[in-house]
């Protein structure tokens, strides 16, 4: 009898816990990972209250205006989505696609373009699906966005004649790039990527976001991961950058840029991702200033120099 009483109490506790935490998980999921209205994740600074973020935005917009005569607006369709971008033609035969982080549009990506212009690249900035002018509602953590990245790569080669395509990813943007370059459908002319602050797994980095926001982790974190799977089909437990990067082709070239004080892609995990990368030509660079995705604003000269010198080799 006591056995059934204990089982009943445990079951009741689980039901109560689920009833209490599931609405929290839904709120977190739809707030952080779903474009619930067209104005969300639009072409606007995602955090104007953040001094560094606003400075990056303004500097990027200024750079784009200075190079406005070089830009062509582009659009593709992939996986049922209309996707928009801007192609800056500097007369080179290779191009970098800047892959922004979560909540960011193509205008955010302007900020990362200057070292590539200096290194002899054309530059493509894009509104990832469900951001900016691009259609879509659900963020798939880079997994399905990777097919969009491949489609953009083909446009650069077939329409604009770029001999090589490279990726520059910031946070979740790198995840899309890693999933793309390790996909069997990825063209041979995609040669490698530069990453700033990529995570080993989305669950790992999102856990740190939730801790910072003082949200309950158990069982909310894993309920959010299950909601991702329910609405997008993405299996966060399997589809991880640290798994995919082990399959990258040996002749790819990869530059890892990480901050010593990044609280979301922490140094310990960053070293694991670098170690797992199967590319023979890879380099890891550390920066002692700047938080997550804010390395260039705090180390502009070094950041740009590392990129330019990487492509001189």
Where are these regions (language model features)?
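Catalytic nucleophile-loop/oxyanion-hole region of alpha/beta-hydrolase
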Residues: 131-160, 164
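Acidic catalytic loop of the alpha/beta-hydrolase fold
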Residues: 260-265, 293-294
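Hydrolase active-site cap/lid region
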Residues: 179-236
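Conserved alpha/beta-hydrolase "acid-adjacent" motif
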Residues: 237, 263-269
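An N-terminal hydrophobic leader/cap segment in hydrolases
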Residues: 8-76
């Amino acid at each position: 009898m006591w056995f059934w009483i204990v089982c009943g109490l445990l079951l009741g506790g689980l039901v109560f816990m689920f009833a209490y935490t599931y609405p929290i998980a839904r709120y977190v999921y739809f707030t952080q990972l779903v474009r619930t209205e067209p104005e969300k994740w639009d072409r606007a600074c995602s955090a104007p209250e953040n001094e560094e973020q606003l400075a990056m935005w303004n500097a990027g917009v200024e750079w784009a205006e200075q190079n406005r005569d070089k830009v062509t607006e582009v659009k593709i369709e992939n996986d049922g989505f209309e996707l928009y971008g801007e192609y800056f033609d500097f007369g080179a035969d290779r191009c970098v696609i800047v892959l922004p982080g979560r909540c960011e549009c193509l205008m955010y990506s302007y900020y990362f373009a200057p070292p590539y212009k200096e290194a002899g690249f054309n530059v493509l900035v894009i509104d990832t699906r469900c951001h900016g002018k691009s259609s879509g509602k659900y963020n798939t953590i880079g997994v399905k966005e990777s097919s969009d990245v491949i489609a953009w790569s083909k446009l650069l080669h077939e329409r604009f004649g770029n001999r090589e395509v490279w990726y520059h990813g910031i946070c979740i943007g790198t995840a899309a790039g890693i999933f793309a370059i390790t996909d069997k459908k990825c063209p041979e002319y995609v040669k490698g990527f530069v990453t700033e602050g990529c995570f080993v797994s989305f669950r790992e980095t999102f856990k740190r976001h939730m801790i910072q926001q003082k949200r309950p982790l158990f069982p909310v974190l894993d309920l959010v991961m299950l909601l991702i799977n329910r609405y997008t089909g993405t299996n966060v437990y399997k589809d991880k950058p640290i798994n995919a990067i082990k399959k990258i082709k040996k002749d790819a070239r990869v530059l890892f840029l990480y901050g010593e004080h990044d609280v979301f892609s922490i140094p310990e995990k960053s070293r694991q991702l670098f170690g797992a990368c199967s590319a023979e030509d890879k380099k890891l660079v550390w920066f002692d200033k700047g938080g997550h995705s804010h390395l260039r604003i705090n180390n502009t000269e070094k950041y740009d120099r590392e990129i330019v010198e990487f492509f001189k080799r």
